[in-house]
């Protein structure tokens, strides 16, 4: 039971935190230059989702399903190139190290870290909910 909770949480965060990070990036890049407050808010949210991704990647240690990695649903062979091009065209700084680290993720490492991960997972889940609520509220206010 604990193993499923940890694995599903990690996989969910890797998938949805990237999508939400990209939503914030699209907002940031799409606002007219004069909308500085909206741009700054979108940038802050994007950075928060990047931080969440970094934390999950750092602590993953193979606690995810091999099929998820094989499917390329987290990152594809085009993701890094697309991020670099987006940075060039928009001037928005995207942390490409996150994508490179995701490309290096491995599944099914030996070792039982699930119990130790529980507290981190709970914190990430709370943070993700808070960020999602904030991003949804931001999008509704536009």
Question: Which ranges hold each PLM region?
Answer:
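Surface-exposed peri-terminal alpha-helical interaction modules
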Residues: 1-142
